[in-house]
Amino acid sequence: MVNETRVRYFRFINGEMSQAELADRAGVSRQTIGAIEGGDYSPSVWLAIRLSRILGVTVEELFISGEELS
């Protein structure tokens, strides 16, 4: 399951990037970003990597909670 709060968190620490801006840079719809943030959609590996690169974090930081790493 996607950790929905992490994408939103990293969007905001990256200059308060909007869902639309992140979606545009990632090549997906704004609705897709909203669904990822809401935990309703798990991104493909390609999209997870793309989002992590745009946001400047690792895939693990973006999608794996601390509990899952233990």
Please report, for each region that a protein language model flagged, where it lies by residue.
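Helix-turn-helix DNA-binding elements, focusing on the entry/boundary residues of the two helices
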Residues: 19, 30, 45-48
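DNA major-groove recognition helix of helix-turn-helix/homeodomain DNA-binding modules
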Residues: 46-61
